[in-house]
Amino acid sequence: MSHLADLVERALAAINDAQDVAALDNVRVEYLGKKGHLTLQMTTLRELPAEERPAAGAVINEAKQQVQDALNAQKNALESAVMNARLAQETIDVSLPGRRIENGGLHPVTRTIDRIETFFGELGFSVETGPEIEDDYHNFDALNIPAHHPARADHDTFWFDATRLLRTQTSGVQIRTMKNQQPPIRVIAPGRVYRNDYDQTHTPMFHQMEGLIVDKNISFTNLKGTLHDFLNNFFEDDMQVRFRPSYFPFTEPSAEVDVMGKNGKWLEVLGCGMVHPNVLSNAGIDPEVYSGFAFGMGMERLTMLRYGVTDLRAFFENDLRFLKQFK
């Protein structure tokens, strides 16, 4: 057994001298492997009398366990040392300036839409949407727009065939709403619309917001008061507003609304009017009982006026130098 004690002492010394996990594994193989020094000690048991073998085997197993415990402890120590060294190399200097993650921002037209939806939402209006590929009935016929009206011409409208087109206005949403809901009705209809035009103040696709109220005893006074309050809220100022007589097939009387600009000139901002009796009838609403008003405005136009943008096309060019100004 003195030889066994010597093997254990040598194994423990080798374990203590191991400087890395690989060297430590070599020690394990040398002493506890299949042909390791301590493992082979079990073969000496056959030379002992049968009654001595259990006690001798227990001593050998105890020696092997002592070496295994030392191996485990040294392995943990070596792995901890490696981890600590790695962490020391990867230590973050908290005094250094952080890498800034740049936040995105809402598109200025989206800001305008959200602002308008919030204002009218507080007045009890709900938001309704509809298809961008529209039929001629909802886009023209139901809105009292005659067959000879220039808005139906190819040079103004994108037609797919004789009855299908890219909608030129969101008014079709109003028709569907009036057919599906009973008065009182208060809705706004934001969305993309399409017209065959492209210059500094027009694009083939733009965003429009239309509003509609239908109820008993709705008057032009209600229309003027609502829009005046809206414009004051949108431009965050006590605006000078005027209503000019105009013509739209779907409203009667009709008006265009201007606000006084900072340069002392009137600026057109939207169109409006009392819903034409024919439009109410087309939607299944009795014009003898109910009346209503409607209005429509271009989101890009209002955004240009609010932020002082001079070219509408800038909203669609995705120039970050331009868009970052609105964050």
Curated annotation (Swiss-Prot):
The gene is pheS. The keyword Protein biosynthesis applies. Tetramer of two alpha and two beta subunits. Mg(2+) binds at residue 252. It comes from the Bacteria. Keywords: Aminoacyl-tRNA synthetase, ATP-binding, Cytoplasm, Ligase, Magnesium, Metal-binding, Nucleotide-binding, Protein biosynthesis. This is Phenylalanine--tRNA ligase alpha subunit. Its cofactor is Mg(2+). It comes from Erwinia tasmaniensis (strain DSM 17950 / CFBP 7177 / CIP 109463 / NCPPB 4357 / Et1/99). The keyword ATP-binding applies. GO terms for biological process: phenylalanyl-tRNA aminoacylation. One of its GO terms (cellular component) is cytoplasm. It catalyses: tRNA(Phe) + L-phenylalanine + ATP = L-phenylalanyl-tRNA(Phe) + AMP + diphosphate + H(+). Signal peptide: none annotated. Belongs to the class-II aminoacyl-tRNA synthetase family. Phe-tRNA synthetase alpha subunit type 1 subfamily. HAMAP family: Phe_tRNA_synth_alpha1. It is found in: Cytoplasm. Its main location: cytoplasm. Disulfide bonds: none annotated.
